[in-house]
Amino acid sequence: MSITPSNQNITSLLKKESILNALERGIRLDGRKNSDYRPISVTLNYAKKAEGSALVKLGDTMVLAGVKLEEEEPFPDTPNQGNLVVNVELLPLAYETFEPGPPDENAIELARVVDRSLRDSKAVDLSKLVIIPGKKVWTAWVDVYVLDYGGNVLDACTLAAVAALYNTKLPKVEIEGDNVKIIKEEKTDVTPIAYPVVTVTVAKIGKYLVVDPSLDEESIADVKISFSYVQDGRIVGMQKSNFGSLSLQEVDVAESLARSASQKLFEELKKQINM
């Protein structure tokens, strides 16, 4: 049976009431505490043809990130740096309202936040992507595909991108003068990422703040705020979404929840990579 807009509004109201009733009892509908993540798994080298890849499952959300390297000329203003390009695609199979075609504003915003977290944190060492200074560099294309949308896709996208970059080994390069020979079959031990960065999203539902909102929680959230961290606890990015508001006190509480929850993401990365 199709759901009409009026029925959908009733459904949302009933859903919100159930979620709020659970939060009043100190628990969420799926049994988590407000500060808990859903089950997380990270699988490296999932796409064998990519230079590096990672599949991340976060509850019902599933995201695949792949890295491809292309030999290019550097930008004139950064002759001693390679390039980083992040794309996010919300595949039609991931959710019923996602449509084929060019990335929409949601995918573009996701890509922008992931890219900014990697750049502003200096986690990606662009100097490692230099082949010949001023002449040849690598462009690292980080393509992130949302395969199943089960809520809180941003945290999964950042985690997948970071894991895929750790899984990437630069190919061997032989240089004679201005001649460059790329030996893609032989990998070095050099990765383009220096240290990990994670993103933690907190949603405000009524008067409650919850980490890692599920799809149901996300659909009735008043506002979401996301924090990006490096391992030493520095905040390297922050993003607010939805039209609701947060008081300064709520931002402080949300940041405290996010900071604590970030350790769970770092622990999951440690299981797969050397940090």
Swiss-Prot record:
GO biological process: rRNA catabolic process
Entry's Gene Ontology cellular component terms: cytoplasmic exosome (RNase complex)
GO molecular function, one term: mRNA 3'-UTR AU-rich region binding
Cytoplasm among keywords: yes
Gene3D superfamilies: GHMP Kinase, N-terminal domain
Subcellular compartments: Cytoplasm
SUPFAM superfamilies: Ribonuclease PH domain 2-like (SSF55666), Ribosomal protein S5 domain 2-like (SSF54211)
Membrane-spanning ranges: none
Alphabetic keyword roster: Cytoplasm, Exosome
Function of the protein: Non-catalytic component of the exosome, which is a complex involved in RNA degradation. Contributes to the structuring of the Rrp41 active site.
Subunit structure, interactors included: Component of the archaeal exosome complex. Forms a hexameric ring-like arrangement composed of 3 Rrp41-Rrp42 heterodimers. The hexameric ring associates with a trimer of Rrp4 and/or Csl4 subunits.
NCBIfam families noted in UniProt: PRK04282.1-1
Similarity-based family: Belongs to the RNase PH family. Rrp42 subfamily.
HAMAP family for the chain: Exosome_Rrp42 (MF_00622)
Protein name: Exosome complex component Rrp42
Name of encoding gene: rrp42
